[in-house]
């Protein structure tokens, strides 16, 4: 295939949409582990019943069914909110439709979460706000039975087939017991590169404030082991597919060149997914037939020796103050939502550190789970 056609297709997909005049919105996705407090596997039949009750109560509509006929995704047609299960029925996700105000998202999320908790508690189940399911050893860590997740599971389990000078962890099923959150923002063309540069620069600060993925009793030195799961699996064979940008983007040409250097490992054809070893995009279409990161260091409980902790938290405070001013300028009173982060900065902690401190002080794991299940 002609190289210029490939470049143009990538431009149309990733750059051109930012040129359309539109209002600015925010979207949020939050994944949470489901736990059986009896320390037994989560019964997926119970999860399917709760999904049905949720859909009836909030008038959500079916969006996706697995190969066994069970609903794994449902959507609200008014706001665009989605209830789904990510990778496994052990991992629930609430994706909030776009809004201008954070409080509107917070209100709907709280309503959904409270309903789900009430239903789960009938079976001695709970959601909790931990990034790694602390009861993963009791669960059936199997993928949702559909083409997409079966393809992903196969890809992650193929790490044993590679003889590469990189470290592969031995948790290919990590998607079934680890959770994440995402934020989506509308960005205009003129702000695209400055925004990507800015977000790259705050990644280490995010690690300091938000780390929340402790693999209890195994890798407790890591406060955000989910990054290790993501980067040291088959997704990370090409480092441009994971982590931060390895270069400082200066232009849209730099961004496109970076996108061109990423790899694909599957394709969908006639409704079916086909796996392949990771291959760079440009190389794929040319077939005859179709430096270290500071963020990684801040994922550890122990800061590197060259980091001055006082200066680090002074930087964290300055970044939070910039965020506070930005929210004040929006005029919705949303700056109050930053107070927990100012508290973390003041106490030099984050959810992962707090979890480990509670454990070391003798707090029982179930008590920690319930503490992390509370809406703040």
Model segments located where?
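Short, structured patches in soluble enzyme cores that scaffold and shape functional sites
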Residues: 131, 185-189
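Short, low-order "capping/linker" segments at domain edges
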Residues: 140-154, 226-237
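The substrate-binding groove and active-site-proximal loops of carbohydrate-active enzymes
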Residues: 95-106, 184-186
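C-terminal accessory/tail domains of diverse enzymes
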Residues: 1-93, 97-98, 174, 190-197, ...
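Carboxylate/His-rich catalytic cores and anion/metal-binding grooves
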Residues: 116, 120-138
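Acidic, His- and aromatic-enriched active-site or binding-groove loops in soluble protein domains
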Residues: 145-172
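Short, conserved phosphate-binding/catalytic loop or strand-edge motifs used
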Residues: 175-181
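Well-ordered, non-membrane alpha-helical segments in soluble/globular domains
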Residues: 108-113, 316-319
């Amino acid at each position: 295939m002609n190289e210029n056609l490939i470049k143009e297709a990538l431009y149309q997909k990733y750059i051109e949409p930012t040129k359309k005049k539109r209002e600015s919105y925010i979207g949020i996705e939050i994944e949470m582990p489901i736990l059986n407090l009896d320390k037994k596997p989560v019964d997926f039949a119970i999860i399917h019943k709760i999904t049905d009750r949720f859909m009836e109560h909030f008038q959500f509509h079916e969006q996706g069914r697995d190969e066994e006929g069970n609903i794994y995704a449902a959507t609200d047609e008014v706001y665009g909110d989605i209830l789904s299960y990510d990778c496994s029925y052990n991992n629930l996700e609430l994706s909030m439709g776009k809004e201008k105000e954070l409080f509107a998202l917070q209100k709907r999320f709280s309503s959904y979460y409270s309903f789900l908790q009430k239903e789960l508690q009938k079976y001695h189940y709970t959601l909790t706000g931990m990034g790694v399911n602390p009861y993963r050893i009791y669960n059936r860590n199997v993928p949702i039975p559909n083409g997409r997740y079966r393809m992903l599971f196969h890809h992650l389990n193929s790490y044993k087939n590679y003889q590469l000078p990189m470290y592969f962890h031995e948790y290919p099923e990590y998607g079934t017991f680890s959770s994440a959150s995402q934020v989506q923002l509308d960005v205009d063309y003129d702000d695209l590169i400055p925004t990507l540069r800015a977000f790259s620069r705050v990644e280490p600060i995010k690690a300091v404030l938000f780390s929340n993925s402790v693999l209890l009793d195994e890798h407790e030195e890591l406060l955000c082991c989910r990054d290790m799961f993501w980067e040291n699996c088959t997704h990370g064979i090409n480092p441009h597919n994971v982590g931060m940008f390895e270069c400082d983007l200066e232009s849209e040409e730099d961004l496109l060149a970076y996108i061109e250097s990423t790899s694909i490992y599957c394709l969908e054809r006639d409704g079916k997914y086909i796996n392949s070893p990771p291959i760079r995009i440009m190389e794929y279409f040319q077939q005859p037939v179709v430096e270290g990161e500071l963020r990684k260091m801040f994922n550890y409980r122990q800061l590197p020796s060259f980091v001055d902790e006082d200066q680090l938290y002074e930087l964290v405070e300055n970044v939070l103050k910039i965020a506070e001013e930005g929210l004040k300028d929006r005029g919705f009173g949303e700056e109050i939502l930053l107070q927990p982060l100012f508290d973390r900065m003041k106490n030099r902690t984050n959810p992962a550190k707090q979890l480990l401190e509670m454990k070391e002080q003798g707090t029982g794991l179930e008590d920690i789970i319930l503490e992390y299940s509370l809406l703040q």
